[in-house]
Amino acid sequence: MSRIGKKPIEIPDSVDISINNNEVTVKGPKGELSQVVDQSIILEEEEGQLLVKRPTDSNHHKSLHGLSRSLIANMVEGVTNGFERHLEIVGVGYRAQMQGKNLVLNVGYSHPVTIEPPEGVEIEVPKNNQIIVKGTDKEVVGQVAARIRAVRKPEPYKGKGIKYAEEQIIRKVGKTGK
């Protein structure tokens, strides 16, 4: 039995889950998310919990079991609390600012880089070297944060670039002169 898949998903009172032809729709205070789950996965709702079950113990069903449970649990978490990723900008003259809903990054290129967030994702810039990406869908929040980081990845010598707040940059020693 999948250790992740066999855990029941706790459904808070503020969240409403509807299952229609293997499409799971989760509505909560922060919004609504829907996800299509594989046809072989069995979903049962009982006493404020959602149980995810699989028909057989084949490797294919085992992998889908844990995946489906995690996706639905992330949807429930997203519509109740939401997700956020924090990024930091390191480097002299590197900064971020908002122009309307768009994020404008000045990170050492000859031109500013503009990033337009997709629907359902909010970007905040509390300081000009900090970025916060917020949203209900964990996957989309992670993708937007990765796209921002990819504009100028941190380099290993001075650590300049855009990094996740919790990320540790492994530093290299520069070349030594004779």
From Swiss-Prot:
This is Large ribosomal subunit protein uL6. The lineage of its organism: Bacteria, Bacillati, Bacillota, Clostridia, Natranaerobiales. One of its GO terms (molecular function) is rRNA binding. Belongs to the universal ribosomal protein uL6 family. HAMAP family: Ribosomal_uL6_B (MF_01365_B). It holds the Pfam family Ribosomal_L6. One of its GO terms (biological process) is cytoplasmic translation. Coiled coil: none annotated. This protein binds to the 23S rRNA, and is important in its secondary structure. It is located near the subunit interface in the base of the L7/L12 stalk, and near the tRNA binding site of the peptidyltransferase center. One of its GO terms (cellular component) is cytosolic large ribosomal subunit. The keyword Ribonucleoprotein applies. PROSITE patterns: RIBOSOMAL_L6_1. Keywords: Ribonucleoprotein, Ribosomal protein, RNA-binding, rRNA-binding. Part of the 50S ribosomal subunit. InterPro entries: Ribosomal_uL6-like, Ribosomal_uL6-like_a/b-dom_sf, Ribosomal_uL6_a/b-dom, Ribosomal_uL6_bac-type, Ribosomal_uL6_CS.
